[in-house]
Curated annotation (Swiss-Prot):
Protein name, per record: Short neurotoxin 2
Disulfide bond annotation, renumbered to this chain: C22-C41, C36-C58, C60-C71, C72-C77
Entry's localization field: Secreted
Keyword Signal: yes
Family indicated by similarity: Belongs to the three-finger toxin family. Short-chain subfamily. Type I alpha-neurotoxin sub-subfamily.
Protein task: Binds to muscle nicotinic acetylcholine receptor (nAChR) and inhibit acetylcholine from binding to the receptor, thereby impairing neuromuscular transmission.
UniProt keyword ATP-binding present: no
Keywords, in A-Z order: Acetylcholine receptor inhibiting toxin, Disulfide bond, Ion channel impairing toxin, Neurotoxin, Postsynaptic neurotoxin, Secreted, Signal, Toxin
Signal peptide extent: 1-19
Length: 79
């Protein structure tokens, strides 16, 4: 019984470390994803001398003015 209890506790603990899948490709590159410890994904959009730039990743960072930030909370929501 003790061993079974330890196995159940281990499984429950491992499930608590759920990771989210966020897109992490830049601008118009082919879609790529990464597993994140954060519970959100972001998409930053801004314009510079090269045109419209897009950065994607994990979390929800603070941005400077002039940068559009979208944060979301489902897998691959920042594509």
């Amino acid at each position: 019984p003790l061993l079974l209890t330890l196995v159940v506790v281990t499984i429950v603990c491992l499930d608590l470390g759920y990771t989210m899948t966020c897109c992490n490709q830049q601008s118009s590159q082919p879609k790529t994803t990464t597993n994140c410890a954060e519970s959100s994904c972001y998409k930053k959009t801004w314009s510079d001398h090269r045109g419209t730039r897009i950065e994607r990743g994990c979390g929800c960072p603070q941005v400077k003015s002039g940068i559009k930030l979208e944060c979301c909370h489902t897998n691959e929501c920042n594509n």
